[in-house]
UniProtKB/Swiss-Prot annotation:
The keyword Metal-binding does not apply. Coiled coil: none annotated. It holds the Pfam family RecX_HTH1. NCBIfam families: PRK14135.1. Modulates RecA activity. The gene is recX. It comes from Listeria monocytogenes serotype 4a (strain HCC23). This is Regulatory protein RecX.
Length: 269
């Protein structure tokens, strides 16, 4: 079998169409063309053609991977998953990853360090959430343990407290006790330890005093009573107390407030 013609592709000037015995057979990257010294009149065996095709697949995948990396740093697993989606064969993926490593395009430790620093500075995620994300990106436990140490206790508390203040602003109609519990629960879900979550909750709610809580209770009593006034007095009272307790106010606090303010649920005559 001989190469009878070589032509440049119209849409990609760096790729060439190879014709064997007057018929199109395959296309190659410019680098592969030069490496295998492909030219008109050169004889090729089937085995050589297959080798060239495989080399071109690697070259094509390498170009795709480098372009993929141009947007941001990636872990080895992210690149492998990307190449699989590009329908690259296993042998090609392994060779591409080796070439990328040799070219210093892949370094999971550097990736993990950069990713962790970015998450600490730009998000309010807890360390456990960052650890989980690194696992999903294919990082080893050894690397994860090494880089997560960069998330100091001080930085964790600072971020957790910022997150706690956000949670507090969204739930400012609840009693202090329930608000703290809500903050703790949310912070644990965001990857912080229960101990640090409790500290952040205390810090965020430290300025809420008895007067503030009394004001919140007053507003909630008025709102809940308006909502329940269509019920019979006994039912309205029960529903009001239940609703207030669900917002974190204790039964004794509610009863004291109702008594001190002479609030009655009797029907008006």
């Amino acid at each position: 079998m001989k190469i009878t013609s070589i032509s440049v592709q119209q849409k990609n000037k760096e790729r060439y169409n190879i014709f064997i015995d007057e018929k199109y057979n395959f296309s190659v990257d410019e680098e592969v063309l030069a490496r295998y010294q492909l030219m008109k009149g050169k004889a090729l065996t089937e085995a050589e053609i297959e080798e060239i095709k495989q080399a071109d697949m690697v070259r094509k995948g390498l170009n795709k991977a480098i372009n993929f990396l141009s947007h941001r740093v990636r872990s080895e697993k992210e690149i492998r998953d990307y190449l699989k989606k590009q329908e690259m064969e296993a042998f090609a993926i392994d060779e591409i990853l080796k070439k990328l490593a040799d070219m210093d395009y892949i370094n999971d430790l550097e990736f993990a360090e950069l990713y962790t620093k970015t998450q600490i500075k730009t998000t309010l995620k807890g360390p456990r959430t960052i650890e989980r994300e690194l696992v999903e990106k294919g990082l080893t436990r050894e690397i994860i343990s090494q880089v997560i140490e960069e998330y100091s206790d001080e930085a964790q508390l600072e971020n957790a407290t910022k997150q706690a203040i956000k949670i507090m602003k969204r739930n400012n109609k609840s009693a202090k006790k329930m608000l703290q519990q809500k903050i703790i629960t949310d912070l644990i879900q965001k990857g912080y330890t229960s101990e640090l979550a409790k500290t952040a909750a205390t810090e965020a709610t430290s300025e809420i005093d008895i007067a503030d809580e009394a004001d919140i209770l007053q507003k909630q009593v008025e709102k809940t009573m308006r909502k329940n006034k269509r019920y019979k007095p006994s039912i309205a009272k029960q529903k009001t107390i239940t609703s207030l307790m669900q917002k974190g106010f204790s039964y004794d606090t509610i009863q004291s407030y109702l008594t001190e303010n002479e609030i009655s649920f009797e029907e008006e005559e």
